[in-house]
Amino acid sequence: MGAARLLPNLTLCLQLLILCCQTQGENHPSPNFNQYVRDQGAMTDQLSRRQIREYQLYSRTSGKHVQVTGRRISATAEDGNKFAKLIVETDTFGSRVRIKGAESEKYICMNKRGKLIGKPSGKSKDCVFTEIVLENNYTAFQNARHEGWFMAFTRQGRPRQASRSRQNQREAHFIKRLYQGQLPFPNHAEKQKQFEFVGSAPTRRTKRTRRPQPLT
């Protein structure tokens, strides 16, 4: 009889315990993984090993390549120009990078007025850009400190005011190209120069003598 009386009480306690656990689970929502990725992508990664890539950036508007000649940044370099070779370092495990000129060793940065300048150190947030791959296969670079400000150049290859640049504008579109070094012909004059053939006296072709066939 005692066991029969305890059974309903145990069942009730078990039901109350299950209900309590369900209530606590509803009060604590599941973690948002996408938000976590966005938060971590906005922070500089000091633990992981940085990836380094080398390439050129072809400007859609100027038809030339981005070059870093010191403090000056422009998009007027020809393919293979030594100042057009860029070293791109990853800043986070996301798509944020730092861009440095291989020859000048200056980082592409953006000041508070939205002007592109070269700096010897790229540690500040002004020198960090977010790569955005567009639907037309071009790439845009948004400054990490000034959200909505993009790296952009005019048709003449001069930097455009970043506050007036937008992601969908041609001035902010770039194509990554492998750097293959200086071209075999450094200037147009030598490219047009014809090859010279080395002169030599003509050789006379001798007649081939045949051996007499043995008589059978």
From Swiss-Prot:
One of its GO terms (molecular function) is type 2 fibroblast growth factor receptor binding. Keywords: Developmental protein, Disease variant, Glycoprotein, Growth factor, Hypogonadotropic hypogonadism, Kallmann syndrome, Secreted, Signal. Residues 1-22 form the signal peptide. Glycans are attached at residue 137. It holds the Pfam family FGF. Residues 204-216 have a biased composition (Basic residues). The keyword Isomerase does not apply. Preferentially expressed in the embryonic brain. CDD domains: beta-trefoil_FGF17. One of its GO terms (cellular component) is cytoplasm. GO terms for biological process: cell-cell signaling; fibroblast growth factor receptor signaling pathway; nervous system development; neurogenesis; positive regulation of cell population proliferation; positive regulation of MAPK cascade; regulation of cell migration; signal transduction. Residues 190-216 are annotated as: Disordered. It comes from the Eukaryota. Coiled coil: none annotated. It is found in: Secreted. InterPro entries: Fibroblast_GF_fam, IL1/FGF. Belongs to the heparin-binding growth factors family. It is linked to Hypogonadotropic hypogonadism 20 with or without anosmia: A disorder characterized by absent or incomplete sexual maturation by the age of 18 years, in conjunction with low levels of circulating gonadotropins and testosterone and no other abnormalities of the hypothalamic-pituitary axis. In some cases, it is associated with non-reproductive phenotypes, such as anosmia, cleft palate, and sensorineural hearing loss. Anosmia or hyposmia is related to the absence or hypoplasia of the olfactory bulbs and tracts. Interacts with FGFR3 and FGFR4. Plays an important role in the regulation of embryonic development and as signaling molecule in the induction and patterning of the embryonic brain. Required for normal brain development. This is Fibroblast growth factor 17.
